């Protein structure tokens, strides 16, 4: 039987593979020595295929090593062999809890490289889609987080409201998860008749539900004890590790791309950016609660001012003509053939575009050598970056705190591993 690992040996462990090898048999480790615990890659609280290697001294964590990559699909390499519009469905599978928001950011990145400005109506509809995705993502994150911390009933409240949003998304896009709603230069279809009124009705009944959900958690002693002063991330650490989204703002850093670097006309909307003061799990929870209210505020303004007009740019090289025209006119038939076989003709150049997604800043860095296929596409995943701070904040906490800290970061492995 292998000998237990001493404190001195632990400090010399060079990498994850060595940790795994040396932790194969620790059942006979003498008292006072440390233990390696494999959490995952299949564990309920990770909400995805994610492994966390924990070094324990009793119940106290002394070292943490996140192990990612189990859900790697090679999305960036796939993009190099696909036309720009063909890659839209792959963005659904990044943060699959907010596919609409992924669609929007990717389309904006390609349009920035093309130098296109989409019509005002399409911009407003994209804002609506992004904020609906933010609400649905936060509902999922908060419900699962509460359940992980022992408040199972809250999960039922959040999922009931999330289902209402999915019904609206399904009516708009034709799908609940794999929406693929955007196209380079616009959208696949316009708003269905009566859809905006349904969304207004949802917002009206949803705001009291947010208060109800908050009431079930904010004054819940068990939830408060498990989240307050747990997993504290200072402003300096949040910035140094490149955190974005609610995890950054929960530490009190006022950074929101919708305010700092407005896109899609976000500068026209009146909304607040909620901030935390301590940077603990509770602050990150409160930021997401308030963000849902602010998203409803943005949606109200957007629904009140949806301009008429087209939903796509007037660029024949980038958009399919109407089917009726393809069947009757030679020019439209040729245009249809070129767009389908060659894709959008993007000029040579490189561009980065980042959008404020529910998990943080989702960015696309695209290099083009001309033509309809990118030379290189790099995805800036907020979940991947946010997970990088775990080795910093987990040591010193109890093993029971790990679940609360992981849930407060609200990561999704489809986007992290891509």
From Swiss-Prot:
Protein name: NADH-quinone oxidoreductase subunit D
EC number: 7.1.1.-
PANTHER family membership: NADH DEHYDROGENASE [UBIQUINONE] IRON-SULFUR PROTEIN 2, MITOCHONDRIAL (PTHR11993:SF10), NADH-UBIQUINONE OXIDOREDUCTASE 49 KDA SUBUNIT (PTHR11993)
UniProt GO molecular function: NAD binding; NADH:ubiquinone reductase (non-electrogenic) activity; quinone binding
InterPro entries: NADH_Q_OxRdtase_suD (IPR001135), NDH1_su_D/H (IPR022885), NiFe-Hase_large (IPR029014)
Subunit structure of this chain's protein: NDH-1 is composed of 14 different subunits. Subunits NuoB, C, D, E, F, and G constitute the peripheral sector of the complex.
Record field: catalytic activity: a quinone + NADH + 5 H(+)(in) = a quinol + NAD(+) + 4 H(+)(out)
Gene behind this protein: nuoD
Transmembrane regions: none
Chief location category: membrane
UniProt keywords, alphabetically: Cell inner membrane, Cell membrane, Membrane, NAD, Quinone, Translocase, Transport, Ubiquinone
Role summary: NDH-1 shuttles electrons from NADH, via FMN and iron-sulfur (Fe-S) centers, to quinones in the respiratory chain. The immediate electron acceptor for the enzyme in this species is believed to be ubiquinone. Couples the redox reaction to proton translocation (for every two electrons transferred, four hydrogen ions are translocated across the cytoplasmic membrane), and thus conserves the redox energy in a proton gradient.
Pfam families in the record: Complex1_49kDa
Keyword Signal attached: no
Gene Ontology terms: cellular component: plasma membrane
Primary enzyme class: translocase
Recorded family membership: Belongs to the complex I 49 kDa subunit family.
Membrane topology: Peripheral membrane protein
Localization per Swiss-Prot or TrEMBL: Cell inner membrane
Domain of life: Bacteria
